[in-house]
Amino acid sequence: MIKLGVIADDFTGATDIASFLVNNGLPTVQLNGVPPSDFKVDTQAVVISLKSRSCSAEQAVADSLNALAWLQQQGCQQFYFKYCSTFDSTAKGNIGPVTDALLEQLGETQTIISPALPVNGRTVYQGHLFVMDQLLSESGMRHHPVTPMTDSNLMRVMEQQAAGQCGLVPYAVMDQGADAVKQRLAQLKEQGMRYVVLDTLNEQHLLTQGEALRDMKLVTGGSGLAIGLARQWADSTKQTSSATEAGKPQSGAGVVLSGSCSVMTNKQVAHYLKQAAGRAIDVARCLESDDAQQSYAQELADWVKAHRDDALAPLLYATSSPDELAQIQQRWGAEASSHAVEKLFAAVARQLQEDGFQRFIIAGGETSSIVVQTLGIHAFHIGPSISPGVPWVRSTTHPLSLALKSGNFGDEDFFARAQKEFAA
């Protein structure tokens, strides 16, 4: 029976939380999209990855309720709405509406908001989200092309886009342990607080949350909360090693595809270009006629194939600085340019798969999503972590291994380390 069912709002976020579940003792399978009603899976945790982070609230709600219905059919005991640790959601965002819809469908009146991931520098203090030593609103996320985060107060952000009031469990209460947190949640529930932000400064706070929230029907947050919940649900750690083993990367030709324009991905691309062959994507050529786009995709695939025997996999990147990105969006439009680049990456990936490439390292949630769909991968095993929240994964049905990285995750040497430390 599935103990924990996770509804993740993007592909890289799904692999992020799946890796934390596996590494903390809970065997996990990730599903790419909602499977048919008769699809069965034998595991203790399931992560359903959607592509709802940047879409309209209406579409995100519909997709999330569809995922919830499948998990309910499987007899799932606890539900987890997973979003980014930087709470990617503006005043018109969909985290609030999705949370409201899930609460209503489950007949619940309260849930928690816990995006923190201290190991990656995401902490919550007095209800405000920090990235390292900066308020979220003063970090690189304020320049995000789709969800610019200009307010660090999670209670205020939540109330702007959701239907209820939002309270807080401050760090002083969190320090007192699970019983104190439960008591505070009960008090806030009596006061009509539909959502409760949880201060989180360290991993012990995540463990406390896991213990306190074991019986809450719906929880919401980033991947950090999974650390505590997995340890509450896990029977033992014996199954963890076998689950990780199933996801280890296999040998074969590889490629790095980078569609993210985050601060860290810019650093990673610049660092990798000093070690490996790289080629920048020409956005203008992505927006030409269909025949021209096909020709460009073939040209790029041929370039990658020419480097298939290199010591490090070749890199194709659309990664650009905030200034360059602003110019691109001003000239061609944010949505049009983003869609065109994703379509190109998908076409290149398809050609490389047909030519026997079996290892794909991908930076960016949207890029990861469309490439995984194009490669025909519906489910995969979670393998060893390259960086916190970024594991290697292996298709359950195809000879394909992938590393799907959220924009700001990983260190500067991520692309090379993913290959060197996990050589098959």
UniProtKB/Swiss-Prot annotation:
It comes from the Bacteria. It catalyses: 3-dehydro-L-erythronate + ATP = 3-dehydro-4-O-phospho-L-erythronate + ADP + H(+); 3-dehydro-D-erythronate + ATP = 3-dehydro-4-O-phospho-D-erythronate + ADP + H(+). Belongs to the four-carbon acid sugar kinase family. Keywords: ATP-binding, Carbohydrate metabolism, Kinase, Nucleotide-binding, Transferase. Pfam families: NBD_C, SBD_N. This is 3-oxo-tetronate kinase. GO terms for molecular function: ATP binding; kinase activity. InterPro entries: 4-carb_acid_sugar_kinase_N, 4-carb_acid_sugar_kinase_N_sf, NBD_C, NBD_C_sf, OtnK. NCBIfam families: OxoTetrKin. Signal peptide: none annotated. The keyword ATP-binding applies. Its EC number is 2.7.1.217. ATP binds at S260, G364, G365, E366, T367, G407. Catalyzes the ATP-dependent phosphorylation of 3-oxo-tetronate to 3-oxo-tetronate 4-phosphate.
